């Protein structure tokens, strides 16, 4: 029977895309394995793979009940899909030599299913080692206090391998231990520690110190840490996609033609992922900052949430049919048309970052965006919004020096026009911190290229985990 590896991502496009890249990588370098990826029927935004090395199995699913928080939905879908998954894995095991199941954190409900079938389970951590350190240390933090992180406010948490992290900067779903989401995350962290191994979308050169601390067991002081395999960066190979999703087209996006006419490394790109929405007031402030900076820019703008009281971001799709111009200062588009372009909702992020005219990136610090930027050698300004992005920001700014920070209002986490103008200008033209960041990101890019090359650290890690599966 053919040696088979099954991948089971949660129904989030970014997770599916990254898991597909892992499957392609396995199929390319270890063709002895048959790769099957199981997708829930809820994966409506799932990209299509034409890789001959990957078999896609669509799993029927039972709709989960409405969740109080948006981020609970992937957990709930996996929990309500366990019986279907059990049948699918049993069917695969009856005709193939099933060596391992690879899941992500949101599909954690699959862990006991695989254990009952005697299938070794590996977690694929789609973010970086900095966020992984937080997740692995959560059970320890949970046992050290009875308070929720939201009640600890700006109290500093000491997580091995990371700069000091404010309790308020922990991933959003961890803020209140009374939330169902918190319980799901805590269970996922505990299961991850008990798994056969953790595959991470990073590389040794980018996060060497944090990876070393994790491997030494400092994040999990009371139990053995599972084997860690840094196999990244895994960047979407179909370059007309981005981390945030969106419709793609065979026709070249107009923003790329505009970039063709701009000087080398002169344009700052602003893009905030699929859920990054700002209030109308913040959009106007951002526009004013870009105008004051005098820097060339390409700005992807999503309409603000319909709830005018929203102060920062929302995952809502409401308002997508609204004109962007109404949220800009009067005359802004006309005054900046010679040096700026505003794109509604979506742009081909990987192609933009890889364009020779782009010299900077204002990002929400989503991990896919970070590794895409570093892989392209583009320095960043960090503007974290949700999920684990504040942890990623701490790594980018304080540890790796690959991004400049933004000062935010204590009241509503807004950024002033002057602050954005100052940091964008420093990133693109500055001789101080901006120059350091520009130089550091080019060095980090070289490290990534080396890690992915034959004999590089990521290839060695992939071979190491594959060797475990071969031994079975």
Region spans (language model):
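Glycosyltransferase specificity loop/lid
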Residues: 1-472
């Amino acid at each position: 029977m053919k040696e088979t590896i099954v991948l089971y991502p949660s129904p989030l496009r970014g997770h599916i895309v990254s898991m597909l890249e892992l499957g392609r990588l396995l199929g390319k370098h270890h063709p002895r394995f048959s790769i099957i990826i199981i997708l829930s029927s809820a994966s409506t935004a799932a990209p299509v793979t034409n890789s001959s090395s990957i078999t896609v199995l669509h799993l029927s699913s039972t709709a989960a009940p409405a969740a109080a928080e948006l981020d609970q939905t992937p957990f709930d879908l996996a929990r309500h899909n366990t019986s279907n998954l059990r049948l699918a894995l049993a069917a695969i095991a009856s005709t193939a030599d099933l060596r391992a199941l690879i899941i992500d954190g949101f599909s954690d409900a699959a862990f006991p299913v695989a254990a009952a079938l005697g299938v070794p389970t590996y977690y694929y951590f789609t973010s970086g080692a900095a966020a992984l350190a937080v997740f692995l240390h959560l059970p320890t933090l949970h046992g050290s206090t009875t308070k929720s992180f939201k009640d600890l406010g700006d109290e500093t948490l000491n997580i091995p391998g990371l700069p000091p992290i404010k309790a308020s900067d922990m991933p959003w779903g961890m803020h209140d231990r009374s939330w169902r989401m918190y319980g799901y995350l805590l269970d996922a962290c505990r299961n991850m520690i008990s798994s056969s191994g953790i595959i991470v979308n990073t590389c040794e050169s980018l996060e060497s110190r944090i990876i070393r601390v994790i491997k030494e067991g400092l994040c999990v002081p009371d139990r053995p840490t599972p084997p860690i395999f840094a196999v990244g960066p895994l960047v979407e190979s179909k370059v007309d996609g981005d981390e945030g999703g969106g419709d793609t087209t065979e026709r070249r996006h107009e923003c790329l033609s505009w970039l063709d006419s701009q000087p080398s490394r002169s344009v700052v790109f602003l893009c905030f992922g699929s859920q990054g929405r700002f209030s109308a007031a913040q959009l106007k402030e951002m526009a004013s900052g870009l105008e004051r900076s005098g820097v060339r820019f390409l700005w992807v703008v999503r309409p603000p949430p319909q709830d005018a009281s929203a102060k920062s971001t929302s995952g809502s799709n409401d308002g997508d049919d609204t004109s962007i111009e109404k949220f800009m200062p009067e005359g802004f588009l006309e005054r900046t048309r010679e040096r700026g372009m505003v794109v509604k909702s979506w742009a081909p992020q990987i192609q933009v970052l890889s364009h020779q005219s782009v010299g900077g990136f204002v990002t929400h610090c989503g991990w896919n965006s970070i590794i895409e930027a570093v892989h392209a050698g583009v320095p960043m300004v960090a503007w974290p919004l949700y999920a684990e992005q504040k942890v990623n920001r701490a790594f980018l700014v304080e540890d790796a020096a690959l991004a400049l920070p933004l000062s935010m209002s204590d009241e509503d986490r807004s950024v002033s026009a002057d602050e954005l103008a100052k940091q964008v200008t420093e990133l693109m033209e500055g001789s101080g911190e901006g120059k350091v960041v520009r130089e550091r990101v080019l060095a980090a890019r070289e490290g990534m290229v080396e890690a992915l090359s034959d004999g590089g650290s990521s290839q060695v890690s992939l071979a190491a985990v594959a060797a475990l599966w071969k031994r079975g």
